[in-house]
Each structure stands twice: as structure tokens, then as C-alpha cells.
Amino acid sequence: MEYILVIFCFEDRAEDLKIPTFVPVSDLISLLGELFGTKGKALHAEPRGIILDKNKTLAEQGVEHGAILTLE
């Protein structure tokens, strides 16, 4: 199984996460909400500077190791 290592930033926290490459962003948003009690409808990726498509995975959208993800 392949993974992407990312930094998830929310409120005043940052967490290193190892995300399987096959997980769609919509599922990832739900999982992050459950794990960290966060709310958001979109996931933003830096340094790409894009709002991620909920129907695609991080890998399909070119998100690479070390990317910073934030909920919007």
C-alpha cells in the first residue's frame, strides 16, 4: 500500500499524517473531522495552492509528500 506524508493544519495545531493514496478527498475530509473534531467542506493543498476535488485522491491531484493541507 502506498502513502503520502502530509501536514494537516487546523486552528493552532499541525499534525503529521500518513494518508493512503487510494482515499478520496471526500472520505479524508470526513475522517479528519472525526479524528480532530474539525469542520470543513473543502481541503486546500499547499504548495499547489488549490482546493482539492472531493471525488479524486491526493495522488490523482499531484499532492506530494510534505504538502500542507487545511480545511476550509
For each predicted feature, which ranges?
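Generic structural detector for well-ordered beta-strands
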Residues: 16-20
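Loop/turn positions that initiate beta-strands
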Residues: 66-69
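Short structural boundary motif marking the start of a folded domain
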Residues: 1-6
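Short amphipathic, charge-patterned alpha-helical segments
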Residues: 21-40
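Short acidic beta-strand-loop surface patches of small beta-rich interaction domains
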Residues: 9-15, 41-60
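Intrinsic disorder/low-structure terminal segments
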Residues: 7-9, 35
